[in-house]
Amino acid sequence: MSVTTLRRLSPHSSAVTSTWHSSVVALPAERRAATPFHTREWAAAWQAVRTEQVRSRHHLFLQDGSSQHRMSFYQVSNSPLWHAMEDDAGVTRPTFEADVLYGPSLYGEYGGLPGATVPVLAEAVDRGRALARDIGTEALVITNIPPVERTLWCQARTPDTEVVLYWAHRARVGASVDEFIANFPSASTGREFRSQHRRGNDAGLTLKIARGSELQAHVAEFGTQSVRVGDGHSPALYGTDMLAPLTRVPGAVGLLAEHSDGSFAGGFFCFRYGSALYLWTAAIDGARNGDLPIYSWLMYESVKFAVDTGASVLDAGRFDYAYKARLGMLPVALMSAVYLTRPNPHLVSRLGALHTGLNQHVLRAWNKA
């Protein structure tokens, strides 16, 4: 069953219609999504996720004239990724005291609704906030909005507060690894980058490129060994329930480092999508590898893979701020807009503390770069 609304937002705007659906399967076919995190396959993967405790799932189909959009919303009671952000920020108590409605998933590196007009965004917020109230959540959180879209969301509906949860990292690939390294802030960083790759080669590391069922065979290793390089903690952010269906997202590929005996040393779970190679998460077998620079070796191999597959952008994802700053990657602030379901100054205060703490966390990392 679906519920449709039709409203005319201004004398000069087109009518926007929207309908709720419990699954993406019943929705009309979509145009090619802007990122892998906006695909139907990504949304479908969250239909059975348990690592993030999702209590209900709601997919909003929006029609604006001939343009169609979909935005997925998730009622979450416990998110390991959100708790990791609280840990990084050093806050002393949980931000939320009840369920939250995220739109879309917090785990997608980029959120928002790329390509949508302001009336469509306004409809998404209005329907999302009404749903958030109806199901008893504290807030609607529109997650991980890149700078190019932030103004549009704020113009559509001013949020009660905003939080930059993390920064993505992007770099132009160029025609070769040498061209990529030439853009590093210092020559010494380039020498170290090459040296660490040679050390991995000398130790017998080889690259395995895994897709589909071959990648699915390694999801348990990504679930248990996922890391955020440079962090003093590594909460269990990912589970096989999450990772296995993500192998079916367009462009999903594992860049795996293997020892000479064929055993797993580490890997990047990636998406080669559009013009970019997205490095979504990393897994490193730290217990066996000691001081072997697996992460840097994989980063070098990722650049090679991006060059070989014609990617123009390397999107190195979130976290690992000091390391990525040393490589001269462009940081991109990802803002999450929070719309409260009722006035709650204490929640706004806690969100402000989270924002400040995360900003300080990133600045400390950059100062170490």
Question: Positions of the model-derived regions?
Answer:
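Active-site/acyl-donor-binding loops of N-acyltransferases
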Residues: S2-S13, Q75-S79, P147, T151-N183, ...
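A conserved beta-strand-loop-helix scaffold within acyl/acetyltransferase catalytic domains
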Residues: L6-V91, T143-G290
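Acyl-donor binding region in acyl/amide transferases
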Residues: N78-T161, G274-A333
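Short C-terminal domain-edge/linker segments immediately following a structured domain
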Residues: V91, D99-Y107, A171-G174, R198-G204, ...
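Glycine-rich loops and low-complexity Gly/Arg-rich segments
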Residues: T95-D99, V164-H169, R194-H197, D231-S234, ...
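A broadly tuned preference for mixed-charge, low-complexity surface segments
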Residues: Y107-A122, S186-T206, A257, A265-F269, ...
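Short, flexible segments with low predicted structural confidence
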Residues: A217-H218, Y295-S296, G352
